A protein has these predicted regions:
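Short secondary-structure boundary segments
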Residues: 97, 155, 177, 238-240, ...
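Extracytoplasmic ligand-binding site segments that recognize negatively charged/polar headgroups
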Residues: 160, 175-192, 233-252
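Alpha-helical, coiled-coil/dimerization segments enriched in small aliphatic residues
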Residues: 119-122, 242-271
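Bacterial N-terminal signal peptides
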Residues: 38-47
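Short helix-initiation/N-cap motifs at beta->coil->alpha
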Residues: 79-80, 130-141, 267-275
Length: 346
């Protein structure tokens, strides 16, 4: 009897030991699971915190004006029938046509000009630039020593000159000489893009809005005044007796826009037909300020014209007009006010 009880006791103890061991294993598994979850949570929290701090530290572009040079360039520039890739913002330009020097001065980019034409307008500050000749007679050695990013011209260079510059790694951009107000504006847009890349679009629009306002102020009062009065007959005389602005020229078109009857419309390409000389009876003569007015007064063609008899000979700075820039508008304002002073309160 006693032996049987002992065996039972031993069996019971073995079962209890197994039960306790199994319960401890379960508790350990639960603790491991809890620790694993806690570790995953901490890892996720640290990762998200680092990402947030990194985003806070990264600079952000707020608007278009904050674009870097890399972001504003490269751009493709279409000039005439040619396309140019402007890889980065130009640091240096050589400009061999006076009208392009004026245009860059107008848009505030004259500081980029490291080489300028010999006939550059004195009104544009070029203190840091070297004289490099002209488009038709360039100083190639000087150009190569200046090392511009681009050479700009408004008349075609000789192919031999272009090839020598290309061998030195310098490209030439040939602009069309503008023959209308629209083409003047388009050239300004192109120059803004060349100098400022994508930012140039906004800069160009702001500039051209001011340009148009300035032009309207110069000539609109005269054009409105002639609606209630008769037009004056006028010519824009480059050389006596028949070299004058004809109908297809910009100067001829501007005479019309200012409310004048341009007698030069009978001619073409700055040449008036001599056989029509009897029709040359202008009320006002705008002439190149480099001319001696006595040449006009003594001319058999104009000596008895209303313009000479009433002393309506108005000098005009033709060089400023040919620059096709802001100085041209100043000359137009003087012409319009001379012809129709009443329209301007005179």
């Amino acid at each position: 009897m006693t032996l049987t009880l002992q065996k039972v006791t031993i069996k019971i103890n073995e079962n209890r030991t197994f039960y306790l061991l199994e319960r401890n294993v379960i508790r350990m598994k639960r603790r491991i699971q809890t620790l694993t979850l806690a570790l995953c949570f901490c890892t996720a929290f640290l990762f998200s915190s680092c990402s947030f701090m990194q985003k806070q530290e990264e600079p952000q572009v707020q608007n278009h004006s904050e674009l870097t040079s890399t972001e504003s360039f490269p751009i493709k520039l279409n000039v005439g029938e040619e396309e140019y890739l402007i890889a980065s913002k130009p640091r240096s330009l050589a400009v061999l046509s006076a009208d392009l020097v004026q245009a860059l001065g107008d848009i505030g980019a004259a500081s980029l000009i490291s080489g300028a034409c010999t006939d550059a307008p004195s009104s544009v500050s070029l203190s840091a630039s070297q004289s490099c000749g002209t488009a038709l007679n360039p100083n190639l050695q000087q150009l190569i020593s200046v090392r511009p990013d681009w050479v700009l011209v408004s008349v075609p260079m000789l192919q031999s000159s272009i090839e020598q510059l290309e061998q030195a790694g310098i490209q030439v951009i040939c602009f069309d000489y503008p023959d209308s107000i629209d083409s003047i504006k388009e050239r300004y847009r192109t120059l803004f893009s060349l100098c400022y890349g994508l930012e140039g679009t906004q800069k160009a629009e702001a500039f051209l809005n001011e340009y148009q306002q300035r032009l309207d102020t110069a000539i609109q009062p005269a054009s409105e005044y002639v609606r209630v009065t008769s037009k004056k007959k006028a010519i824009y005389l480059a050389q006596p007796d028949y070299t004058m602005a004809t109908g297809e020229t910009l100067e001829g078109e501007l005479l019309d826009q200012m409310g004048f009857d341009n007698l030069g419309e009978l001619g073409s390409r700055w040449s008036y037909p001599e056989v029509e000389s009897e029709e040359l009876v202008p009320d006002i003569i705008f002439y190149d300020s480099q001319l001696d007015p006595e040449q006009i007064i003594q001319s058999p063609v104009y000596s008895q014209s209303p313009a000479v008899l009433s002393q309506q000979l108005i000098p005009v700075d033709f060089s400023a007009m040919r620059l096709r820039g802001l100085p041209m508008i100043d000359q137009l304002a003087q012409m319009a006010q001379s012809g129709y002073p009443q329209a301007y309160g005179g």
